[in-house]
Amino acid sequence: EYEDRFRREGRQRQDDAGRTLRPPPGADRRSRPRGGRRHQPAPGGGLGLAEEEAATLPAMGVRLPFIKEYLRGSNPRIASVDAMIKTTPPGTGSRLLRVREANPVHDACARRVELDGADAGLMVAGAFTEADLGVACYHSKVGAVELYLNHLIDGRDEYVVVDMTAGADSFASGLFTRFDMTFLVAEPTRRGVSVYRQYKQYARDFGVELRVVGNKVNEPEDLAFLRDEIGDDLLVTVGGSRWVRAMEKGCPAPFGELEEENRAALTRLQKCVDATYARRDWERYTRQMVHFHLKNAQSWGNERTGANLASQVDPDFVLDESGRKRIPGGLRHLLDQDAVTDAV
C-alpha cells in the first residue's frame, strides 16, 4: 500500500488508523536541488557519481516529517509527529526498517548506485540551504539519520555504512553509539592522533568498538608514528591511490582496478565488521537509545514540544533482529535511571 502511494506521486492514502498520509515534499527524485545546495560539494563522488547527478540525491533532512510519520506507525506513546524528536525510540506499534526491503523511507530517500555489477542504496542527510544559514545547525539534518538507525534492523551480511562528521562533533547526540564498529580515519600527524584520542576518551563509557584507519601513510616513518601513538587500535593503513585520484578528477574506473594493497585493506575492514556480529548486544543498543532520548528530552525536547517525552519510552520493548522481542519491564531492568522508571 505504501509503496504504491509513493509511486503515484500526489495520491493520498490512509493507514490502518485512518490517518491520511501524503508523499513528502520533493518526492520526485528528478527534482532539482533547492537553495544553496548546488554550491556545496555533492555527496556520492566516492562512488563515482558525477557532481550533477549527486546534487539531485533526495535529502533525508527535507523528508524528516514524512520519515517521522512512517516510523511512528501506530505507537500509542507518540501522540503526533510534532512530538517526535531525533532520539525518539521505537516501541510497540512503531514501524521498523530492514536493509533489504522495499519501504517508503527507502523509496523516498535512497538512490540505487551501480557498483560493478551490483548496486547499493545511497542516502544523504542533506546540505544547508540558504534558509538554514545562520539559524540552524547541521545536527538538525542528521536527526533523520539517527531516527533511521534507531528503527533499523540489520542482519548478518547486511551493511549500513555512515560517513559521520569528524571528531567530537559526533558526540552531539547518541548517533555515535548506533554502530557495531566505528572506523576513525587518522593521518600520521599530531592532529590526527589527537582526534583519535579525544574520540576514544568520549566513547570509553559506551562500549563503542573503535579501530583506526591510517590515511596518507606513504613512508615507513608514517607507519611507525601511528603504531607508536595508536597501538593495537590501528587496523590498516592506506597510501596514495591513482584509482582514487582518477575518481576525484571525474574519471572513475571500475572497482576491480583498485590497487591490490588497497583492496586488501578494504577486505580487512569488512572482516573486522563481520566479526562484530557475534558480539552484537541489542539490549545495550536499546538501553543507550533510551538513555540519550531522556537526556535530550530533559535538556530541550520537553520544552520544545510541550510534552513529557520520557513517556514515549516503552518499558517492555527491546529492539532485536526479529523485530518482535518484548521483555516485560525490560527497560526497568536494563536501565538504572530512576527517571525512566518513574516515567514509564
Model region roles, listed by residue range:
Residues V135-G256:
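Conserved catalytic-core segment of NTP-binding enzymes
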Residues M84-A168:
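Phosphate-binding/switch loop-helix module in NTP-utilizing enzymes
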Residues A17:
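Hydrophobic positions on the alpha1 helix immediately C-terminal to the Walker A/P-loop
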Residues G10-R11:
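Walker A (P-loop) phosphate-binding loop of P-loop NTPases
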Residues Q14:
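Conserved lysine of the Walker
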Residues F6:
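Hydrophobic anchor at the beta1->P-loop junction of P-loop NTPases
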Residues P24-A118:
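N-terminal phosphate/diphosphate-binding loop that engages ATP/GTP or pyrophosphate donors
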Residues D205-V344:
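C-terminal lobe/tail of nucleotide-utilizing enzymes
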